[in-house]
């Protein structure tokens, strides 16, 4: 399973989180965010990471030219669009950055907003479904309504986000079947300051879920 830890701000924490098992790290490229990191900071962190770890830059309503420039400066392997980006803009980036993963993050408020997800199936590589907040775009700690997602099917990979933390992870994965999970505030002491004990606990819970899942498969 893909495990993305978002809001990395410190090189030593990024390296430690990758060593604990995270295969994807996220960097906030939004200046107004308390988790914001500059392109230079992102590059410094990336230089200390294992090569197989995916490095995702998170943007909110940034111009395509800015995104392309930051990817070139930093070595990001993916771009996550967390604002009001249209399918057309996503497609434009996909063409401009053919070797870069394009992730569209969508805040799910209702069944209707979930139906709108289909508009992006052809224009991105991956989807990320997050909790809705009227004023904030992500990292809120709010939990998405899992019942809305119960019947969700996607032809492309999707990540579950929205208020995930070690103590509710097993419950979420028992109800849903995402290709991966995304956590930020659920493994933090403060915005941008990751709690490595919580990250370790997260992987313990994930191992527990995998063991239970295998047991159920064998029973059937």
Swiss-Prot record:
Pfam families: PRAI. One of its GO terms (biological process) is L-tryptophan biosynthetic process. CDD domains: PRAI. It is an enzyme of class 5 (isomerase). Pathway: Amino-acid biosynthesis; L-tryptophan biosynthesis; L-tryptophan from chorismate: step 3/5. Its EC number is 5.3.1.24. GO terms for molecular function: phosphoribosylanthranilate isomerase activity. Gene3D superfamilies: Aldolase class I (3.20.20.70). The keyword tRNA processing does not apply. It catalyses: N-(5-phospho-beta-D-ribosyl)anthranilate = 1-(2-carboxyphenylamino)-1-deoxy-D-ribulose 5-phosphate. Transmembrane segments: none annotated. InterPro entries: Aldolase_TIM, PRAI_dom, RibuloseP-bd_barrel, TrpF_fam. Keywords: Amino-acid biosynthesis, Aromatic amino acid biosynthesis, Isomerase, Tryptophan biosynthesis. Belongs to the TrpF family. This is N-(5'-phosphoribosyl)anthranilate isomerase. The lineage of its organism: Bacteria, Bacillati, Cyanobacteriota, Cyanophyceae, Oscillatoriophycideae. The gene is trpF.
């Amino acid at each position: 399973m893909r495990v993305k830890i978002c809001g990395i701000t410190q090189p030593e924490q990024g390296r430690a989180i990758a060593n604990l098992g995270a295969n994807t790290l996220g960097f906030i490229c939004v200046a107004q965010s308390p988790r914001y990191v500059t392109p230079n900071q992102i590059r410094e962190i990336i230089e200390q990471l294992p090569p197989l770890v995916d490095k995702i830059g998170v943007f909110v309503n940034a111009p395509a030219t800015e995104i392309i420039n930051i990817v070139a400066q930093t070595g990001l392997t993916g771009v996550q669009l967390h604002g009001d980006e249209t399918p057309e803009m996503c497609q434009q980036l996909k063409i401009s950055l053919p070797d870069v993963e394009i992730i569209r993050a969508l805040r799910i408020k209702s069944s209707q907003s979930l139906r709108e997800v289909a508009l992006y199936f052809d224009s991105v590589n991956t989807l990320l479904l997050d909790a809705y907040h009227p004023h904030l775009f992500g990292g809120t700690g709010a939990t998405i309504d899992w019942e809305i997602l119960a019947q969700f099917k996607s032809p492309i990979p999707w990540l579950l986000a929205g208020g995930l933390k070690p103590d509710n992870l097993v419950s979420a994965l028992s109800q849903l079947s995402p290709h991966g999970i995304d956590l930020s505030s659920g493994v933090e002491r403060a915005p941008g300051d990751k709690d490595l004990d919580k990250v370790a606990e997260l992987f313990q819970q994930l191992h527990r879920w995998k063991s239970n899942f295998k047991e159920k498969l064998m029973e059937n």
